[in-house]
Amino acid sequence: MSGNKMKMEFLSKSQNESFARVAVAAFISQLDPTMEEITDVKTAVSEAVTNSIIHGYGDREDGIVKIQCEIFEKDITIIVEDDGIGIEDVKQAMTPLYTSRPDLERSGMGFTVMETFMDELRVESTEKNGTRIIMKKKLKSIE
């Protein structure tokens, strides 16, 4: 199989998180991933989208979350992007158990979860200009 890609965007409403992970899972299903690989990708997408909604936009439900997904052979690249408040200190934000919203019952493990389930994670952010999360995963061939 050669390459394929898709883009979508949706409002920063928490109910759209499940839509996003199911849409990405459906898109990558053309690569015939294992159930474990699908679960890994869905979990990482869920964490990235949740971060955009909760941390990027806070209580605003009119923000836009964008997802791009590209596949080439067995390689998947997923980009989750928002135009929210951005991250002041990306390195600190990626520290396990750190949260910028202690008022919420969150564990501060979102980036750690993304790193665990994906092969590569890169976070680009500018304060007041949003965040871009780039995740990559190479699927194992079942042959």
Curated annotation (Swiss-Prot):
Mention one GO molecular function.
ATP binding
Q: Does the keyword Translocase apply?
A: no
Enzymatic class: transferase
Entry-linked InterPro entries = Anti-sigma-factor_SerPK (IPR050267), Anti-sigma_F (IPR010194), HATPase_C_sf (IPR036890)
- List the catalysed reactions: L-seryl-[protein] + ATP = O-phospho-L-seryl-[protein] + ADP + H(+); L-threonyl-[protein] + ATP = O-phospho-L-threonyl-[protein] + ADP + H(+)
Q: Which SUPFAM superfamilies match?
A: ATPase domain of HSP90 chaperone/DNA topoisomerase II/histidine kinase
Its domain of life reads: Bacteria
Give the record's keywords alphabetically. ATP-binding, Kinase, Nucleotide-binding, Serine/threonine-protein kinase, Sporulation, Transferase
User: Which ranges of the sequence are coiled-coil?
Assistant: none
Q: What is its EC number?
A: 2.7.11.1
Q: Which GO terms describe its biological process?
A: asexual sporulation; negative regulation of sporulation resulting in formation of a cellular spore; sporulation resulting in formation of a cellular spore
Pfam families on file: HATPase_c_2 (PF13581)
Q: Which NCBIfam families match?
A: spIIAB
Q: Which PANTHER family match?
A: ANTI-SIGMA-F FACTOR RSBW (PTHR35526:SF3), ANTI-SIGMA-F FACTOR RSBW-RELATED (PTHR35526)
Q: Which family does the entry's similarity section mention?
A: Belongs to the anti-sigma-factor family.
Record's HAMAP family? Anti_sigma_F
What does the UniProt record say this protein does?
Answer: Binds to sigma F and blocks its ability to form an RNA polymerase holoenzyme (E-sigma F). Phosphorylates SpoIIAA on a serine residue. This phosphorylation may enable SpoIIAA to act as an anti-anti-sigma factor that counteracts SpoIIAB and thus releases sigma F from inhibition.
Q: List the protein's name.
A: Anti-sigma F factor
Source species, please?
A: Clostridium novyi (strain NT)
Q: What is the lineage of its organism?
A: Bacteria, Bacillati, Bacillota, Clostridia, Eubacteriales
**Gene encoding this chain?**
spoIIAB
